[in-house]
Amino acid sequence: MTNIWWVRRDLRLTDNAALQVALEAGPVVPVFILDPAFSGSSLRRKDFLYEGLHAFDRDLRARGSYLVIRKGNTVQALGELLWETDSETIYSEEDFTPYAIKRDEEVARHLSLNLIHGQTAHHPNSILKANGTPYIVYTPYSKAWKANLPSRLTPAPAPEKIDTPVRIRSEPLPRYKVSPLFPSGEQEALTRLDEFLHRQIFSYSEDRNRMDLEGTSTLSPYLHFGMLGLRQAIHAARQAMIQARGEMPKRSAEVWLNELIWREFYIQILFHFPHVSQTAFNASLANIEWINDESQFEAWKAGRTGVPIVDAAMRQLREIGWMHNRARMIVASYLVKDLLIDWRWGEAWFMENLLDGDLAANNSGWQWTAGTGTDAAPYFRIFNPVLQSIKFDPNGNYIRRWVPELRQLDSKVIHAPWEHGLKAKGYPDRPLVERDKERTLLAYQQSKQRMERV
C-alpha cells in the first residue's frame, strides 16, 4: 500500500525516522506543501528553503523518487493526494512549535496522520523532573538529558532506493536566488559538519565567542530546516569527544554538545509553555514600561546606532541573513537594556530576517538577554557593548568588514570613536543614547513591584 511522506522541517534522507517508518509500510510519495503561513518570511529565507527543496528533489531522484509540491490548505492538499494515489496513511516527523501542533491536530481530525519522533534526541515529554513537571533550569535538564541518552546514537544512513509511483501531479518547484555564503541542502549541511569536525570543533570553547574568527559551525540554518538532524549533530559531537587528543579539545567538543542540548532545552520549554511565544516567561517582568522609540528602533535595524559593534552585527544580519551568536546577545542587550525597547520587537525582526529563524531558539535567546525568560541572565546584567567589542573583536576586524565607514580607524579607537573625539564620514557622530544603567534597572524593578502588588 502506497503512503504519503509529508516532509516539513526534515529536508534530509539521512537519519530520517519518518521516512524509515513510511518505507517499512510500502512505497512512499514525498510531498512538501507550500504553507501560506511561510509567506511572511524574508525573501532570503524563502530562497534558502526553495533552494533546499530543489536539492532535496535531486537527492530523491538519485534514488528513483521525486518531490511532489502542493500548495494551499493543508488538509485539502493532503486529502486530494491521498485520493489521487489511493493511499491510506500520512507519515511525518513530529514538530513541537505551537503552530505545528495546532496544524497537525487539524490534519489528524480529518485524515490518518502518523507522527514520528525524530526532530530531537529526546521527546519533550520524556525528560521530566521526578514530580512529572518539565525542567525550567538548564543545568539539571542537561544532566537528565545526558543520563537518558543511549550509549549508541548512530544515525541511520540514507536509503539507497525509494519506491514512488510515477506521474503524480505536482506544482513546479519554486524559483530561488542562490546565497553564496549559505548554499542550501542536505549535502551542503553534511559538508559543513565534516569541515567543522576537522577544524573548529577542537578549539570551539576558545573561539566560539570571537566575532572576528570563523569559530562556529554555522549549521543553525540547516538544523532549523532539518537538512541536518539534531541527532546527527549530537552523534558527531560525542564522536569528537572520543577522538579528541587532550583535555582542551575534548572540552571544546563537549561545549558544542552543550550548545546542542540548549537547543533541545528551548524546544521543550516552548512545547510545555507555549505562552512564551507571546509574553515573558517570568510573569514579574511582563509589565515593563518600555520607551519603544520607533526612530531608535529603525536606527537599530539599519545598523545606524553609532555603536560600531552593534551596527556591524545588524548590517551582517541585513546582508546575509545570519549573525554570530555573541553578536546576537550584544544587539539584543543594546535594544532592550540601553534603548528600553520591547524585546518582542527585536525578536520579530530577527524572525523576519534570519535564515535560521527558529521560534524556540530565537524566543528563548531574546528572553534570556532581556532577563524575562526561563534560566535567563539576571535582569540587572547589562552588557557594555564597547567592552564586549574589545573582548570579542579585539582588532576591530569584524567591525571593519561590516561598517566600511570605520575601516581606516585604528584598532584602539574603532570600538568607541566618539570617546576619542573622532568622526567618520557618513557614520553617526555619537551613539543614540548615553548609557544609563539606573534607568534600565528602575524600569525592571517597577515591573516587579507592580506584580507584587497584584
Give the predicted meaning of each segment.
Residues 45, 49, 302, 306, ...:
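Residue-level preference for long, well-ordered alpha-helices that form the structural scaffold
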Residues 74-88, 108-116, 160-173, 373-380, ...:
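Short secondary-structure transition/capping segments
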Residues 132-280, 284, 392-393, 397-454:
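Glycine/tryptophan-enriched, flexible segments
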Residues 1-153, 252, 315, 361, ...:
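Trp/Phe/Arg-rich N-terminal binding region typifying the photolyase-homology
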Residues 43-47, 180-187, 300, 389:
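Charge-dense, low-complexity intrinsically disordered segments
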Residues 20, 311, 434-438:
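A broad detector of short, well-ordered amphipathic alpha-helices
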Residues 215-405:
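Active-site-proximal binding-pocket segments
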